[in-house]
A protein has these predicted regions:
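Short, charged juxtamembrane terminal tails flanking transmembrane helices
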Residues: 2, 160-168
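Core segments of transmembrane alpha-helices
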Residues: 66-78, 146-151
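Interfacial segments of alpha-helical transmembrane regions
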Residues: 3-20, 75-100
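C-terminal or internal capping secondary-structure element at the end of a domain, subdomain, or sheet
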Residues: 134-162
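Hydrophobic alpha-helical transmembrane segments of integral membrane proteins
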Residues: 92-117
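Interfacial loop at the N-terminal end of multi-pass membrane proteins
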Residues: 7-11, 15-72, 117-133
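Structural signal for membrane-spanning alpha-helices in multi-pass inner-membrane proteins
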Residues: 26, 77-81, 105, 154-161
Length: 168
């Protein structure tokens, strides 16, 4: 059990590091980047996404490989730490929240990204683009809220000592 507990502890720390970076990056995105393109759609959408390399660089931080890595570390901590009853419920909450975030992003947010980010609004009317911007911002805030709940649950799990003397 001692080795399993050490592995669980390492995975908890790595998962926390990954989610901490995500929380900070998402806050920056919400407070600094999103207002640049959502301020006055459709003009701001077209100016930002046609005039910057945002679509080329955003994948360096928020892309699917990083979603998978964050979730994999968390699921690894849950699986390896399943025998730790005091940690299990917090890890479950964190895993469910983050899994929801990934599924919601892929199923709901990315289709909007395709129109707003990749096509800079495309041939959609100004009203449609404005509506998509509002939907995206609300979805992003909801996704972040659920993610923060998961982050706090993981922080709680990390704050509970893991026994290293062989007991769970």
């Amino acid at each position: 059990m001692k080795t399993l507990n050490r592995i669980a502890q390492v995975l908890l720390w790595l998962a926390m590091l990954g989610l901490s970076v995500w929380v900070g990056g998402t806050l920056y995105q919400m407070l600094v980047v999103v207002p640049m393109w959502s301020a006055a759609p459709p003009e701001s959408v077209r100016a930002f996404f046609l005039g910057t390399k945002y679509n080329e660089t955003i994948w360096n931080f928020f892309g699917p490989p990083f979603m998978v890595a964050r979730l994999a570390l968390l699921l690894g901590a849950l699986l390896v730490g399943w025998h730790l009853p005091r940690h299990r419920k917090w890890l479950l909450v964190a895993a469910v929240c983050m899994a929801f975030g990934v599924v919601f992003t892929l199923a709901y947010v990315y289709p909007i990204n395709d129109v707003l980010f990749a096509q800079a609004g495309g041939n959609h009317s100004p009203e449609e683009i404005q509506a998509m911007v509002r939907q995206w911002v609300m979805a992003d805030r909801a996704r972040f809220g659920v993610g923060v709940i998961g982050f706090l649950a993981l922080l709680r799990a990390l704050s509970i000592p893991i026994p290293m003397n062989g007991r769970s």
